[in-house]
């Protein structure tokens, strides 16, 4: 059997709580209940009402009906004791719920025959918790003796004064002295209560410790097999990227960071002359956008400054490019037109943004509506012509050929 050296996980603690195995500092709960009762007793328990009832019966001199007499005493008892009992019950229930983290132990209500097992009973009898309870009992005996000694030194005059007290004040004095004795005992027992709670917490976690195999098995049950989880993640990302793929294919170009940010830009002056952010992805999705754009022939421009600026100034997808970034976007569009003209071997186009209505303006790049078409490169394209992917808007290469690959464009 493997040695249990690992701390219990959160799931292990939750499952144990459902079975009733929670950290319980019962003595602290008892301390709260006793302190609440001692402080509330003088205000809630009115013994003068009992004395007044005796006086009323004696003054009438009549023989009361036994049934009515018992019913009257029962009502009087409930009126006096009910508020006190309810307050003490609430004072005991609230700390218990806090210790169990408001978890109801449903499984602990079931009848369990294993609790009658004599072998387990002997193990509990000679367990660390039993030894702790025995030491705690001895400490409480010492605390009680200390409490009596301190109480006698402090209030012996009041105790002996009870013999000379008036009957009307006798009940009140007894209540006051009893409350003082109880509070003094709780104060002296406080160190023992704290020590008991610390030891109980240690034993609770010691009983729920796990071995390494249990931790791995629980991780597999809660998180699933690593290979299956990775496959699910890939499928999920693939399903989510269908819309993004369509937006990439319809973009005029992709500006990259080069690996952490990918921004798709779409321009159609016939509709609105302002560039439009069609794709806005980061990290792994940005790399996927770049790969898909290169596969479909959509230009990819690696410009760190422009990509970061658009990402910062255009916080949402399907929003217009910020006024501060329009100049940089238009420069890229003009450069793309020059690259296409150089690939065709013709004169450079006019210095304006290409539109989706003019697909013939860019050889090697499919129009926004058909970016992945098979005729992305026309038959009359010069040998060696290439789509303007991962290029740089530095202008066409000499002699009207394809532009030289100058690497990333970092503004």
Curated annotation (Swiss-Prot):
Biased composition (Low complexity): 370-404
Superkingdom of origin: Bacteria
Annotated membrane topology: Multi-pass membrane protein
GO biological process: protein secretion
A single GO cellular-component term on record: plasma membrane
Segments traversing the membrane: 28-48, 80-100, 137-157, 175-195
One matching Pfam family: Bac_export_2
Segments of this protein annotated with the region Disordered: 341-411
Main location: membrane
Function noted in UniProt: Part of the bsa type III secretion system, is involved in the intracellular replication of invading bacteria inside the host cell. Probably necessary for the lysis of the vacuole membrane and escape into the host cell cytoplasm.
Protein name stated in the entry: Secretion apparatus protein BsaZ
Organism: Burkholderia pseudomallei (strain K96243)
Origin organism lineage: Bacteria, Pseudomonadati, Pseudomonadota, Betaproteobacteria, Burkholderiales
Primary gene name: bsaZ
């Amino acid at each position: 059997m493997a040695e249990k050296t690992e701390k219990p996980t959160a799931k292990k603690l939750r499952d144990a709580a459902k079975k009733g195995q929670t950290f319980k500092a019962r003595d602290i709960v008892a301390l709260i209940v006793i302190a609440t009762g001692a402080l509330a007793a003088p205000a809630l328990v009115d013994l003068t009402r009992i004395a007044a009832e005796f006086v009323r019966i004696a003054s009438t001199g009549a023989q009361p009906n036994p049934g009515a007499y018992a019913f009257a005493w029962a009502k009087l008892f409930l009126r006096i004791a009910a508020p006190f009992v309810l307050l003490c019950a609430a004072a005991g229930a609230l700390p218990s719920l806090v210790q169990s983290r408001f978890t109801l132990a449903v499984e602990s209500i079931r009848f369990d025959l294993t609790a009658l097992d004599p072998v387990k009973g002997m193990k509990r009898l000679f367990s660390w918790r039993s030894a702790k309870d025995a030491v705690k009992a001895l400490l409480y005996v010492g605390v009680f003796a200390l409490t009596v000694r301190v109480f006698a030194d402090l209030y012996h005059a009041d105790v002996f004064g009870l013999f000379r007290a008036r009957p009307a004040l006798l009940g009140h004095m007894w209540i006051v002295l009893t409350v003082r004795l109880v509070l003094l005992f709780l104060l002296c027992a406080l160190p023992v209560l704290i020590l008991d709670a610390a030891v109980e917490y240690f034993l609770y976690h010691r009983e729920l410790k796990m071995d390494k195999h249990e931790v791995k098995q629980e991780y597999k049950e809660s998180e699933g097999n690593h290979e299956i989880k990775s496959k699910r993640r890939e499928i999920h990302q693939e399903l989510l990227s269908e819309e993004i793929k369509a937006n990439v294919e319809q973009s005029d170009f992709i500006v990259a960071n080069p690996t952490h940010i990918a921004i798709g830009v779409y321009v159609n002056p016939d509709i609105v002359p302002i560039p439009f952010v069609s794709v806005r992805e980061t990290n792994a999705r940005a790399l996927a956008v770049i790969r898909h754009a290169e596969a479909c022939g959509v230009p990819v421009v690696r410009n760190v400054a422009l990509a970061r600026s658009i990402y910062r100034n255009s916080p949402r997808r399907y929003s217009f490019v910020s006024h501060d970034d329009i100049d940089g976007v238009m420069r890229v569009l003009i450069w793309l037109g020059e690259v296409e003209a150089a690939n065709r071997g013709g004169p450079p186009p006019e210095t304006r943004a290409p539109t989706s209505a003019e697909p013939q303006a860019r050889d090697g790049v499919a129009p926004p509506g058909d970016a992945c078409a098979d005729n992305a490169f026309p038959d009359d394209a010069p040998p060696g012509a290439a789509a303007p992917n991962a290029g740089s808007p530095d202008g066409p290469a000499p002699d009207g050929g394809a532009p030289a690959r100058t690497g990333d464009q970092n503004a």
